[in-house]
A protein has these predicted regions:
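Proline-aspartate-enriched helix->loop->beta-strand connector
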Residues: 25, 127, 151-171
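Binuclear metal-dependent phosphoesterase catalytic core
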Residues: 15, 85-89, 156-160, 173-213
Length: 213
């Protein structure tokens, strides 16, 4: 199975269409930030889901209300709720939306307690791929200026859920690492400027390549 993963388009979906044309993936995963209201519309999503099954979380630059309305060709919603999963073929994909904050002043804020609660739900579901917009602290969380941009709550969620693959975004800087236990953590980078990743899933394991369109 071939999976393409994108993140942080911020209203520019041209790279996504180029990626789909070049890679012809079975599944498209997105770690959020498609674009806000006024940047992206129903027809923009329709043009993508007509080509490929899509699964996404939302970030801090998304039209969340619109994302909830978008459906794949088979009628399934593209957006994963916090602590929920979606199945594709023999993969279980779990999601936690938004970015960390101490409050709910914005619709895309998520607190430590909510991240922990979502992770606890996912623990019961034997998740293969975990997707968040925010990043785990100290793991694939380098910013473009070389500082760390992750949050501890996502690190704890990663440890609890224990997926084979963890995909995140938000920082606009691609990075990756593999833990000593073999789990792969990938920050997709900045798809608006061409970053993306390709995963081949075979024999219960992922092969990974970071690319630029």
């Amino acid at each position: 199975m071939k999976i393409a993963a994108v993140s942080d388009m911020h209203g520019n979906l041209d790279p996504v269409h180029e990626i789909l044309k070049k890679e012809i993936p079975d599944l498209l995963l997105c770690a959020g930030d498609w674009g806000t209201s006024g940047e992206i519309f129903q027809n923009d999503f329709d043009a993508i889901v007509q080509k490929v099954t899509t699964i996404t979380v939302f970030g801090n630059h998304d039209n969340i209300e619109l994302l909830y309305q978008i459906k794949n060709q088979d009628g399934t919603a593209i957006l994963i709720d916090n602590g929920a999963t979606k199945d594709y073929d023999n993969l279980v994909i779990g999601g936690i939306n938004g970015i960390w904050a101490k409050s709910h002043k914005k619709a895309w804020y998520i607190t430590d307690e909510e991240v922990a609660a979502a992770a606890a739900k996912l623990l019961e579901k034997k998740v293969d791929i975990l997707m968040t917009h925010g990043c785990p602290l100290g793991i694939a969380d380098l910013t473009p200026i070389g500082t760390r941009g992750g949050q501890r709550c996502f690190t704890e969620a990663f440890k609890l859920v224990n997926p084979k693959l963890y995909i995140c975004g938000h920082l606009h800087h691609k990075s990756s690492c593999q833990t000593k236990d073999g789990e792969l953590v990938v920050n997709i980078g900045f798809t608006k400027e061409g970053d993306y990743a390709v995963f081949n899933f075979e024999n219960e394991s992922f092969e990974f390549e970071s690319k630029v369109i």
